[in-house]
């Protein structure tokens, strides 16, 4: 289990069962499949409560972004692993590049991918290879599943949840597959 926010947790084993279908066959999972990945507090178990819980978390994260050096970028998310904080930042449509950056206690590293700008147009392999290698976190495979789970969660519920559409039109959370520098050596700046 991965705790996303207080009452919201993702079941990694359930996620792995639909991973192949989503990425290899390019078939979007159904809403009930997505929600079945998550485990909630018994007092927050409805579809609407899950959206409310996640949206509240995202709003809190956005409000905490005060780094002037990155004022031209959008803060996509704020995450903590083992009490270490990281910021995921993107500038989706600037200069026809999408930048995903993790900055914080863990590392300070940027990967840039030339157009197409919108990440949903990238191939599954490119999506999986985009996320930087978070070498200080220990279990890289768990971090990989965490990011992909976020992507599926947002993709699944955004069709019916305006609260989650507002910030994620042009970016998806992606996971690491192998060494991105080695696999796509000419892709990243």
Swiss-Prot record:
PROSITE patterns: MYB_LIKE. Residues 121-172 form the Myb-like domain. InterPro entries: Homeodomain-like_sf, SANT/Myb. This is Myb-like protein T. It comes from Dictyostelium discoideum.
């Amino acid at each position: 289990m991965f705790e996303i926010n207080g009452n919201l947790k993702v079941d990694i084993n359930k996620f792995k069962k639909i991973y192949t279908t989503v990425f290899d066959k390019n078939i979007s999972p159904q809403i009930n499949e997505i929600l079945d990945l998550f485990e909630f507090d018994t007092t927050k178990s409805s579809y609407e409560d899950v959206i409310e819980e996640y949206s509240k978390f995202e709003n809190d994260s956005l409000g905490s972004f005060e780094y002037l050096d990155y004022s031209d970028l959008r803060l996509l998310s704020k995450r903590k692993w083992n009490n270490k904080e990281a910021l995921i930042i993107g500038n989706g449509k600037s200069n026809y590049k999408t930048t995903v950056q993790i900055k914080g206690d863990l590392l300070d590293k940027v990967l840039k991918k030339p157009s197409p700008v919108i990440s949903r147009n990238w191939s599954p392999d490119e999506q999986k290879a985009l996320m930087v290698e978070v070498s200080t976190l220990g279990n890289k495979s768990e971090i990989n599943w965490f990011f992909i789970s976020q992507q599926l969660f947002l993709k699944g519920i955004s069709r019916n949840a305006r609260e989650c559409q507002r910030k994620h039109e042009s970016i998806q959370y992606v996971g690491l597959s192998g060494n991105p520098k080695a696999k796509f050596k000419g892709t990243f700046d």
